């Protein structure tokens, strides 16, 4: 009897999983229509079906949420680093300008041309240093963001999310960005399993546009 009950429960679980997969797939198909036609053509039924399968238990939603939080923290940190560097350069320029003004005021007129020439060389050297430091900072930012993108790609690939692998191909990157946007929109609309609802505790549900007035799924 227990074996029979267990078998029934497995069948019921399978049916629930199939229904959940259908609902996620329908929601994805609806969202894809909002993308440019060039990307719609690349997101085949198989790709969307595989993506829906990966999203079934809600784990990928949690992974994406974590990756986005890390990305935002990284971007904020890099922005603050560049802002600090800009402030340092502003202070440096102000101090140099003040130093030059004071030196010119104390300089005898016949020595002024020599002093100004020396100050110009010093100013050019400082500006060169500033440009090099800004260039190095920008390179650091680009490399750090590239590393984060690669980490995201690798993490989502390991999680079995369709379309994700480590690449620098611009077209593939844009496709992956669109896939992330689809996942994010599903997340915002509440399309996740109740057990893994990112701490919100609500039941798994479809977006309002995918349900009739009684809350039943509407076929695509």
Swiss-Prot record:
InterPro entries according to UniProt: Gonadal
One GO BP: cell adhesion
Tissue specificity as recorded in UniProt: Found in all tissues examined with highest expression in liver, heart and skeletal muscle. Lower levels in pancreas and placenta. Weak expression in brain.
Subcellular location: Nucleus
GO cellular component, one term: nucleus
Protein role: May play a role in neural crest cell migration into the third and fourth pharyngeal pouches.
Family stated for the protein in its record: Belongs to the gonadal family.
UniProt protein name: Protein DGCR6
Biological classification of the source: Eukaryota, Metazoa, Chordata, Craniata, Vertebrata
């Amino acid at each position: 009897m227990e074996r029979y009950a267990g078998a029934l429960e497995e069948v019921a679980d399978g049916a629930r999983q199939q229904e959940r997969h259908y609902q996620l797939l329908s929601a994805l198909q609806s969202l894809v229509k909002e993308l440019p036609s060039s990307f719609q053509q690349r997101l085949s039924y198989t790709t969307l079906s595989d993506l829906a399968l990966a999203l079934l238990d809600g784990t990928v939603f949690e992974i994406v949420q974590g990756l986005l939080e890390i990305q935002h923290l990284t971007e904020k940190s890099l922005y603050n680093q560049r802002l600090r560097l800009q402030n340092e350069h502003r202070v440096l320029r102000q101090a140099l300008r003040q130093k030059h003004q004071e030196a010119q005021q104390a300089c005898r007129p016949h020595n002024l041309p020599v002093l100004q020439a020396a100050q110009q060389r010093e100013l050019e050297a400082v500006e060169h240093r500033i440009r090099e430091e800004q260039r190095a900072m920008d390179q650091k930012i680009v490399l750090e963001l590239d590393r984060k993108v690669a980490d995201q790609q690798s993490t989502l690939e390991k999680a079995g999310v369709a379309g994700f692998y480590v690449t620098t191909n611009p077209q593939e990157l844009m496709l992956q960005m669109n896939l992330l946007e689809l996942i994010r929109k599903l997340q915002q609309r509440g399309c996740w399993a109740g057990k893994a609802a990112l701490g919100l505790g609500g039941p798994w549900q479809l977006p309002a546009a995918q349900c009739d007035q009684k809350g039943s799924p509407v076929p695509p």
